[in-house]
Design a protein with these regions (language model features):
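Terminal amphipathic alpha-helical/low-complexity segments used for targeting or macromolecular assembly
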Residues: 1-92
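Structural signal for interior beta-strand "rungs" in well-ordered beta-sheet cores
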Residues: 92-204
Length: 204
């Protein structure tokens, strides 16, 4: 299956009438998302563009997965998605009980403290996701970013057309800050502690 054909294939899927081929396309798309070969959003000419079909694939993926028990040593979870297991192969450091969910991608050199990175998220090399921070679904985090303790980066799977949160290279997000609703934090920006940024936050 070729990546360049996936957009058309996903766009033509009827969620109410899934064929075996449709299921294979959905599984393959999330597999490529998990490997970092495709992304929910991509940058072109200093603008971030939403790849709506990738997010559609995530929603379809949830619809075809069943809940099941997932073991992590003595811990038992009940969910549709397993956490990633190839941290060493990826070259990322994950401190217990940190979780990077299947379908998220972290470049080599990322440090994940006890925190959570959700499906569709992309985290660039050299970034620190500090203790109890959350990187929500589809969020795009650049290289050498510091997400301080307790930071909440909002996730966006719905509604259709909504942009994910983007934090660009070299940004610093202060402790307990909340960034949601498709906010774009540009390269090298510094956000102080306990700041909340939403799509309606006035910037003066």
């Amino acid at each position: 299956m070729k990546i360049e054909n996936l957009e058309e294939k996903i766009s033509n899927i009827d969620p109410n009438n899934l064929s075996e081929n449709d299921l294979s396309v959905i599984e393959f798309t999330i597999q490529e998302l998990d490997k970092g070969n495709i992304r929910v959003a991509s940058q072109k000419d200093n603008e971030w563009l939403l790849n709506e079909w990738v997010r559609d694939a995530i929603l379809l993926f949830f619809s075809i997965r069943n809940l099941k028990e997932i073991s992590a040593n003595d811990l038992i979870y009940y969910d549709k998605l397993e956490p990633k297991k190839n941290y060493k192969e990826l070259g990322i450091r994950v401190v217990p009980p940190g979780v990077v969910r299947y379908g998220a991608f972290c470049e080599p050199g990322v440090v994940v403290m006890p925190c959570f990175v959700n499906i569709g998220a992309y985290v660039g090399t050299g970034t620190m996701v500090d203790t109890w921070a959350t990187v929500g679904s589809c969020a795009q985090i650049g290289k050498n970013v510091h997400l301080s303790g307790g930071v909440g980066i909002g996730g966006v799977l719905e509604p259709a057309g909504a942009m994910p949160v983007v934090v660009e290279d070299g940004a610093f997000i202060g402790s307990r800050s909340i960034i949601v609703e498709g906010v774009r934090v540009k390269k090298g920006a510094v956000i102080g502690a306990n700041v909340t940024l939403t799509a309606s936050t006035p910037i003066i």
